[in-house]
Design a protein with these regions (language model features):
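Conserved AMP-binding/adenylation subdomain of ANL enzymes
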Residues: 207-224, 231-337, 348, 373
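Conserved ATP-binding/catalytic segment of the ANL
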Residues: 54, 189, 403-471, 488
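Conserved ATP-dependent adenylate/AMP-binding module captured primarily in the ANL superfamily
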Residues: 93-123, 209-226, 257-271, 343
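Conserved AMP-binding A3 loop
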Residues: 34-38, 176, 184-210
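Conserved C-terminal "lid"/linker of ANL adenylate-forming enzymes
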Residues: 494-496, 544-638
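Conserved AMP-binding/adenylate-forming core of the ANL superfamily
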Residues: 3, 20, 24-69, 73-77, ...
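Structural core segment of the AMP-binding/adenylate-forming
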Residues: 12, 49, 81-159, 542
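Conserved pre-ATP/AMP-binding loop-to-beta segment of ANL
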Residues: 19-22, 135-136, 151-188, 195, ...
């Protein structure tokens, strides 16, 4: 076999070198089912040859939709073996979003998890002229579906075994024909300002970035990774397909999104990649359990927690940890930290990464203090998910880590972060103009993020460059920076801040229904719905105090002066967020224009009318009068 320049060649290598070692598991009906690298290859070979028998050709695109399942990963690899590219999509996307991606990418084959996903495709079939084949994984409920272009995964594999009898060397020949600059993935960006763009990632992008990550983190075949992120997320593709193939470690698919936390505890992986919300939810669970504990246990927990966090702050500042604190830390490992890690499923984790948005300093320090090697990572789809990473011993809640070896980072004149390296993508599918806007003549990718390099050589991200502005009083205004400060509160799920060319900063806030609901129940405050809870005077008071805490960490001129609690969460289905939960600012500003006018018009309440979209596409309107609150009640002026 020639050089390992494509992912399929890595698969052949793994089947040869690690044939009997577990490659992937899935939990089905409470039981973990394991597949070795040899079995992984056999399934990929059979499915790839089945696709070939059905007309799949080099350059074709295959899409997958559903939860994390081995057969959906095998399908992506099978397409790549034949010289095609995989196009993963978000399974909770609306029909019009799916149709856009599948048509834009010229998808000819879709592999769906189950009946629910097949039904979505059936509803769109007339809108998908390029579609030739739909394959389903789970046969439950599919018995009476009769279409020539619809087949089960098992049926396609059976076709592949028959095809192999007359084309015995075609699979290996197809892999051998693959080149490093062939497309491996088309990952669609979140589309904060318009339709999502298809970022084209090659095998070279994937493998060279894996080499960089592997040199830093020393991934090994014995590692275990839990695959629960949406398959359309570049982080999932990079870990479950690229890094797993590169390093040979095992990927584990949970039973369902609802069982992830339970499966995490049961599995105890050694590697974990999680967005801030996951870490915040785990910390909240620990805090709630601590609140319900007997007084003695609660005091013991708080004593050791404070000791661990003090030690972590000293360590992060490069200061020595006193002997007494070290001894208390050692005792805490036995009585508190170890049991907490075990309860969360983190006892065996040796590398834990968080990215996509800043993680609150208190949350970051908590996990570091209980012995979790939690570090920040920064990247985006267009650079194959990796730009900078915090090395061991340099973890810090305020930075995105050092630029990785082999990846160059430069700060442009206006503060934009520029990136050059082997992970920089090939371009946007069918959009040369957009590609030229972000990749300059010298090969630098213009990230669109504003940031700087701190005195220690770490990258610090402030906000999206296009969102940065100034207030009418000349104060720098970075909405995401302000929003993240407030979202460090466990009671606040989403924030949208306004203030560009305005006299002061205001914010629309969506509460976290779980933590605020628990807070209300402990205080005997009854509520019937999200809307009812969000408008309780007590809840407005709670959020006011949380904003005050956040304001203490902000410059005087950018502190939030007025706020409003939304009567519903911000949702991707309502076009307020992307599927990766990034605010679509332009749309939100237009939708909530009357609210913004009320903020700056000095009004104390506003008529809030919002449309909500259900999973089946139906829409309904919510209307209510909502109070606008001043953060400081004694504030007499609005300007």
């Amino acid at each position: 076999m020639s050089e390992l320049v494509t992912l399929p060649r890595l698969l052949l290598r793994n089947a040869k070198d690690f044939g009997r070692r577990t490659a992937i598991r899935e939990k089905d009906r409470g039981i973990w089912q394991s597949y070795t690298w040899a079995e992984y290859l056999a399934h990929v070979r059979d499915f790839a040859l089945g696709l070939a028998a059905l007309g799949f050709e080099r350059g074709d695109r295959l899409s997958v939709i559903g939860d994390n399942r081995p057969r959906l990963y095998w399908a992506q690899m099978a397409a790549q073996c034949l010289g095609g590219a995989s196009v993963p999509v978000y399974q909770d996307s609306l029909g019009k979003e799916l149709a856009y991606v599948w048509n834009h990418a010229d998808v000819a084959t879709i592999v769906a998890e189950d009946q629910e996903q097949v039904d979505k495709i059936l509803a769109l079939r007339d809108q998908l002229p390029m579609l030739r084949l739909v394959v389903y994984d789970d046969p439950r409920g599919m018995l009476h579906y009769r279409h020539d272009w619809l087949k089960s995964f098992a049926d396609v594999e059976a076709l592949g075994r028959e095809f192999a009898k007359t084309h015995p060397d075609s699979f290996e020949a197809a892999i051998e024909a693959g080149k490093a600059d062939d497309l491996a993935f088309i990952c669609y960006t979140s589309g904060t300002t318009g339709s999502p763009k298809g970022a084209m990632l090659t095998h070279a992008n994937a493998i060279e970035t894996a080499k960089i990550a592997g040199a830093i983190e020393k991934y090994r075949p014995e590692d275990e990774y839990l695959a629960y992120l949406p398959m359309a997320c570049v982080g999932d593709a990079f870990y479950t397909l690229v890094l797993s193939l590169y390093a040979g470690f095992a990927v584990n698919c949970p039973e369902s999104p609802e069982t992830v936390q339970r499966d995490l505890r049961e599995l105890g992986p050694t590697l974990l990649l999680a967005p801030p919300r996951i870490w915040e939810n785990m910390l909240t669970a620990v805090q709630v359990k601590g609140t319900d504990a007997p007084p003695l246990k609660r005091r013991v927990f708080e004593t050791f927690r404070r000791a661990a966090e003090q030690a972590e702050i000293l360590r992060a500042d490069g200061k020595p940890v006193p002997l007494g604190l070290r001894m208390l830390r050692a005792l805490g490992e036995f009585f508190v930290y170890g049991p907490v890690r075990d309860q969360l499923g983190l006892r065996r984790v040796r590398t834990a990464l968080t990215g996509g948005a800043p993680l609150g300093p208190d949350t970051f320090r908590f996990f570091r203090s209980i012995g979790v090697n939690l570090k920040q990572v920064y990247g985006c789809t267009e650079v194959t998910g990796l730009t900078s990473l915090q090395p061991d011993g340099e973890a810090n809640p305020t930075t995105a880590g050092r630029p990785c070896p082999g990846i160059e980072v430069r700060i442009a004149e206006r503060g934009e972060v520029l990136v050059k390296g082997p992970g920089v993508f090939k371009g946007y599918l069918k959009d040369d103009a957009a590609t030229q806007e972000v990749i300059d003549a010298h090969g630098w990718f213009h990230s669109g993020d504003a940031g700087f390099i701190d005195p220690h050589g770490h990258l610090v991200i402030i906000d999206r460059a296009k969102d940065c502005g100034v207030t009418s009083r000349g104060e720098p205004f970075a909405p995401q920076f302000i929003e993240n400060k407030l979202k460090f509160s466990p009671y606040i799920r989403e924030v949208v801040a306004f203030g560009h060319e305005r006299p002061f900063v205001v914010a629309m806030i969506a509460i976290d229904i779980n933590t605020v609901g628990s807070w209300a129940e402990r205080r005997g405050i009854p509520y019937t719905s999200y809307m009812d809870l969000s408008q309780k005077p007590e809840v407005r008071g709670l959020i006011r105090e949380e904003i005050r805490k956040g304001n203490e960490t902000l410059p005087e001129g950018t502190r939030v002066r007025r706020f409003l609690l939304l009567t519903k969460d911000l949702e991707a289905d309502d076009a307020e967020m992307t599927r990766t939960r990034k605010v679509r600012r332009r749309f939100v500003a237009e939708k909530y224009a009357p609210v913004i006018d009320a903020f700056y018009g000095g009004r104390d309440e506003v008529e809030l009318s919002t449309e909500i979209t259900y999973e089946d596409g139906r829409q309904a309107a919510l209307k209510s009068r909502v109070r606008i609150e001043d953060v400081e009640e004694e504030m007499a002026t609005r300007g």
